[in-house]
Amino acid sequence: MPHLHLSLQSGNNLILKRMKRRHSREQAIDVCRNLKAARPELTFGADLIAGFPTESDTMFLDTIKLVDECDISWLHIFPYSGRPNTPASRMPQVNKHEISKRSKALRDLAQQKRMQHFAKLKEKTLSVLMESEFKGRAEDFTEITTSTPLKTGEIYALKVDSYNADSLIARD
């Protein structure tokens, strides 16, 4: 299935270093571009943390930009929550209101990216593995619903008629 989920966490190099991540922003972008060049149909998902200690507005904007630079369609957003007795707990904290605001901005971006992805798939026929009678997943991990019950565990060629905020809507 041409879907890859990346644990990026942030789009800012200093924040990544403070998180003790082993990759840089530039490495993430290079990996995504190289993979997309080799497999254009590949979609990316990513985990992102909003409000890690010391994250400034400019650092946060680096994360927003990274979503476009890596062509990420699926975002899993986590507001930072501290753990006692960790290195991050001893760093200057971002206030809770700002963490909430940044989390919302990332969730809004996630919805926008999802809608763009769905729009690209409208009117296409996709191979769908049914996970339940009315829901399945396309090869790129996109959820698809049907109005007709289909056999769980089977793969169907379904044409995408429309979409809503959460999934594609297909006919068989």
Task: Give the location of each predicted region.
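Structural beta-strand/beta-sheet cores of well-ordered domains, especially the beta-sheet scaffolds
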Residues: 2, 42, 73-76, 124-126, ...
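Conserved non-cysteine loop/helix-boundary elements of the Radical SAM core domain that shape
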Residues: 1-73, 84-98
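Terminal RNA-binding accessory module
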Residues: 82, 89-172
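Mobile beta-alpha loop/short-helix "lid" or hinge segments that flank ligand
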Residues: 78-84
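A general marker of short, structured functional hotspots
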Residues: 48, 56, 74-76, 137, ...
